[in-house]
């Protein structure tokens, strides 16, 4: 499972400046309290590519009596480039895995996105609605990627 978003960079923006701004934002964004681990795997100024390994909590439900959540781990890549005369930042989320109910006696359940959030796994047999258990993982993972993409766009828009 891979999520990709190409974010347009205005023609007037210098790509090196854009790369530096995104790198600064990334270093702050992935140290927030819901992020349990944010590791910068690589940042290459020559290719303008940033790769991170993130582990964070995704909360499905949080009440006084029940907290339903999972730890999600994923790789996140930001590539600032020019292709066919257009400047863009490609945001890619890959290698997604989950650790669910880790506080249980058995240490919880580990699984990958391919095992849990694909169309085949997340929908009922008629493909008309999400399954209760797997659907929530798909929805929250897509929401997370959209949030990261939107925050990246906002970061670019400040240049």
Predicted regions and their residues:
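Ser/Thr-rich, low-complexity intrinsically disordered terminal regions
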Residues: 1-159
């Amino acid at each position: 499972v891979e999520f990709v978003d190409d974010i347009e960079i205005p023609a007037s923006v210098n790509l090196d400046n854009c790369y530096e701004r995104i790198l600064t934002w990334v270093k702050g964004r992935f140290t927030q309290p819901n992020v349990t681990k944010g590791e910068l795997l690589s940042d290459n100024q020559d290719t303008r590519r940033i790769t991170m390994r993130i582990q964070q909590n995704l909360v499905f439900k949080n009440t006084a009596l029940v907290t339903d959540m999972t730890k999600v781990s994923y790789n996140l890549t930001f590539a600032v480039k020019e292709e066919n005369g257009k400047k863009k930042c490609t945001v890619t989320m890959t290698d997604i895995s989950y650790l669910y109910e880790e506080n249980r006696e058995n240490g919880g359940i580990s699984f990958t996105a391919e095992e849990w959030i694909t169309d085949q796994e997340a929908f009922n047999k008629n493909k008309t609605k999400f399954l209760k258990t797997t659907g929530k993982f798909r929805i929250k993972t897509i929401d997370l990627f959209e949030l990261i993409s939107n925050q990246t766009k906002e970061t670019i828009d400040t240049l």
